[in-house]
Each structure stands twice: as C-alpha cells, then as structure tokens.
Amino acid sequence: MQKDQLMQWEIEGELEAGIPLVPQISLLKKYIAEGNDIVLISDMYLPKEVIVKLLQKADPLLATLPLYVSSEVGHQKTTRKLFLHVYSDLDYCYEKWIHIGDNRFADQVQPEMLGIQTAPIPVPEWTPYEKRLADYSSHYEFRCVARQIQSFRLTHPAPEEQFAYCYAALYLVPYV
C-alpha cells in the first residue's frame, strides 16, 4: 500500500513538474517534416502510459510517435538490448539509423557499438544562480523552480525578460 502511494506521488510529481525541451521538440518536428521516421526510445522506470502523458503535455505530436520504454520492454539502452529490440520489432529496412540523446553512455557509446550513428544533445549547464536555488533546500519545489528558470532562460534570450522572470519575479512572490 505504501509503495503504491509513493509511486502515485512520483507519477503526479513528474506530470506536474515536467518541462518541455522546446529545442529538442523543434528538432524532431524538423526531422518529421523532412520525411524521416522517428521512434522514441527511453530508459525509464515509469510506466509507458505515464511517459505518453508527459509527451502529450510537452507536445501532442510526440504522443503519436512509436515509443519503446525499458520498463515495459524489459531491456535498456545501457545494455544495448533495447536498441536490438527496436531493430527487430520495426522490421528495420533503413539506410541508416541516427540516435539522438543526452546521456553519453546510453545514447552515444552503446548505440555506436552497434553501428548506429549518434548525435549527442548537450545537457544545459545550470547557472550559478540556478544551481544555488536548486541546492538551497531539500524541498523538491526549489529544484522545480530552478528547472523552470533554466528552461525560460534557454528559450528567451532577451536579457530584460530573463531578469524579470529569473530574478525579480521570485522576490515579488511573497507580496502577491
């Protein structure tokens, strides 16, 4: 019972705090517009239905793409077996396979060992301010706020907007 409640809270937290990665979504849409087939592959412990909800929240198009999740398939990218499962399940007949991801080992080293071309996505660094905010408290909410600030900063380059959203707004919250 307690385990089920903890899992439910974890799922609710993920669904509430999930922030779309706009540059990556734009890249996927570009590839789709160019006529490429897109398959989503995830090493994730959450059930596939939860991942689909997160994708739907980020962009409805993402929820329509084929999705392979390690928790459902029983294989992981880190062991290369998830890639092999996708290969056999898709009746693969492509000239090349390009895998895009942000984890050096799971998304670059392992697929390259199978001859899959990789395109690493750099993980955005925290600014010192974002890092201090995320580490400020043991409360999960602080990390969520830091992540939202980072996401805003990465998608809104105007310094005035960044200052207002990332710094000034937090000081005004207690007065609202």
Feature locations, PLM:
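Substrate-recognition element of Asp-dependent hydrolases with the DxDx(T/V) motif
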Residues: 3-56, 66-69
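Short, solvent-exposed loop/turn segments at secondary-structure junctions
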Residues: 44-48, 73-75, 104-105, 124-127
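Structural recognition of alpha->loop->beta junctions
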Residues: 55-71, 136, 146-147
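Catalytic cores of eukaryotic secretory-pathway lumenal/extracellular enzymes that build
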Residues: 60, 68, 72-78, 83-86
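Catalytic or ion-translocation cores adjacent to nucleophile or general acid/base/metal-coordination motifs
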Residues: 71, 102, 119-141
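Conserved Lys-Pro-Asp/Glu-containing loop-to-beta segment of HAD-superfamily phosphomonoesterases
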Residues: 80-105
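Acidic, divalent-metal-coordinating active-site segment for phosphoryl/phosphodiester hydrolysis
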Residues: 102-118
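Flexible inter-domain linker/hinge segments
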Residues: 130, 136-175
